[in-house]
């Protein structure tokens, strides 16, 4: 599994902790605007390879240790998502929509069209080291030794207001703002009504609550578990 979760800019004191299934493609499209030279052809901005190899050295992908070492000199940000909703999104996108399940998920034992309950049970019994990054706890991506690395964390559920707050923080840090957030790879949109249908079984709710306990405590401790498992954050 790729351990380099942060995009670091060479000429700007800026880091982005990328979390798959959390507007990652849209945010990368905004970061693309900060590049000063035309990138190499053949790589999509959505891929980590673009940021590690395709920008003529303007950006690199760094691990959590390197990202934390930059806390005193760089502004870092990221966005998180309700773990229940993130799992439903990953299941729909990677297990139901794709005929060929991605290799790392196949290695976990995940298969096209498998039942949602079996999908969750497989995740619950797979170690963090063997999880596909789309299923990795967000706290693993954004923390080191239990300490949060980014200085700004927004939520997908309040993306519009949090994105504006991020722009204000960037201006305060004397960094270029990122402009409007484009809609990229949004399949379910803002409709999270299907979350409750997937989590009608309280056993599945508790399975996810146990597996993603750190995410819930760190990013969503102010919201009741029942509301989260129904996709309700208000």
Where are each of the predicted segments found?
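Membrane-interface amphipathic segments in extracytoplasmic regions
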Residues: 1-234
